[in-house]
């Protein structure tokens, strides 16, 4: 789990999960406030583990409030189980889906006279293709598409369940963000509230009053 600010300590996943579980069983703790403004993200499996733990915490009847100046996709996955999600007035939620890129070195190796021999057999033996090809093979494209499509389906399912959104709402938001922003005068925050991704827009200085 990574944070942007250098003075923010990186959090061990297991320590975080244990802390949430401990807070659930501590009668002195009424709820959790999560500031995700400097959150850089983590692997999807890690994000889902934290989300699942927060969902379990919420079942205890305690509140969860999540805040961010602007929610990245990773931050929003973690925020999704919250009782209330708050963003800065000029903030909002940025959802992008997943993508994959590779650097290919064959053309460079050809220029310097270096030949790479890849000994492999069968389909989907693509680990060294970036050394022997100039672009991504169909096998590699297909396996990456299948992988990221399945991950994205799980992510959207979790968000839609936690936010009580209709199935397909997240894909609609992502695929139509240009029209959604135009409808809301280019205001990410207002668009995010309209589509029930966040609940309130509050300045950081007003959070305590809120």
Language model features by range: what are they?
Residues 1-178, 208:
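Small-residue-centered hinge/linker elements
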Residues 86-87, 198-205:
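Short acidic-hydrophobic, aromatic-tinged amphipathic segments that line or gate anion-handling sites
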Residues 181:
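Peri-catalytic and regulatory segments of divalent metal-dependent proteins
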Residues 189:
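Short, acidic, Ser/Thr-enriched surface-loop or helix-capping motifs
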